[in-house]
Amino acid sequence: MESIQIHDKQFVPFINRDKISRYVEFLANQIAEDIGPDEVPIFIGILNGSFMFAADFVRNYPNDCHITFVKMASYEGVNSTGKIKHLVGINEDLTGKTVVILEDIIDTGNTLAEIYEIFRDKKVKKLLIATLFFKPDVFRKELPIDYIGKSIEDKFIVGYGLDYDGLGRNLPDIYQLKL
């Protein structure tokens, strides 16, 4: 892995694809063990960032499951705007279902708070949150995160679905903003 440039920023190698695969496999197996083989959960990926994570996750999930997506956004450039844009909703009836949210990254918790707000009236059996990456230093909400692939520092990252102004999602590895 070599340093890369996206738009006007330099990024350095941070987490390679093999480690990412191990985090995803760990999460899929842990959630499958906790939910059990008789429950058919609905996994909900948060677009656009979680599309790679969600795809690899369900490939690793050993039991039956459903998957769908919702689109929300809180970033412009490398900074969180603090404002959530709820762009595409959920059409499935979630009443009495176990729902697992698949997030690419949780930092401030603003998107997570919006997720909890959306699901408050859905009458789900259980709502679980799984994130591939978590930035505990900037997390400001009193909300549970049930599964964490890896905790990282508060530095901007791209790759494996995460972007910088629309670019970098296709990278198979994770890169960190060079300061």
Across the structure, where does each feature detected by a protein language model lie?
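PRPP-associated nucleotide enzymes
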Residues: 1-179
